[in-house]
Amino acid sequence: MNKILLFALLAASVSHGQTYPPEAESPGSTAVHKDSPLYVAWATGITVERGYLNISNPDFMIGGSNRVSSGTPENALGAPTGPTVSLGDRGTATLTFARPISNGEGFDFAVFENGGPGFLELAFVEVSSDGTHFFRFPAHSQTQTDTQIGSFGSPSAPYLNNLAGKYAGSYGTPFDLSELPNDAQLNKNNITHVRIIDVVGAIDPLYASYEGVVVRLCKRRN
């Protein structure tokens, strides 16, 4: 996981058809480059809970630990500059904002992950206006689940919706607060916390990540 940030983008929401917006720089893509002037503020605080190196083998260790350790949490603050922080399998990062995110027209904030076009790093996204009650964006993947995608395969952007990491590297994946249901415990005009939760890329039902209509992300990340 690399960066999360806030921006103001006056655009229509994504249409939810059979497939979703394509890769960055393709016609119809919703990806926003890290240098876009649409970004107006960045996360200012972070708490990370590291996940397993390999959730299917919790006894696997490196350097005496079965949890990931690459990068420091502070690498995820401010504008993307290259350094990252690893979350590991089902790891989480909760970011805070001195300037709350509000529900404007179109997309309201974006999340950066450090995957590449051939290796997407995917995550669920949740938001909170009080730091206690979190609400998850409904995510959907149309990725096939018959065969486990191998180490050099990856889900494809047109089959992914509301998953951080849909776009690789220098491009943020945008989110629209209007897609969340109304709730008395969520003030969409005062979002102070955004939580990123690693998606385990496995079709084994013991470890697979499921959410919304169907989220079955088929890439095993060791």
Label each PLM-derived region with a short phrase.
Residues 18-123, 133-222:
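A domain-level signal for the mature, folded cores of soluble proteins
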Residues 4-13:
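Sec-dependent N-terminal signal peptides
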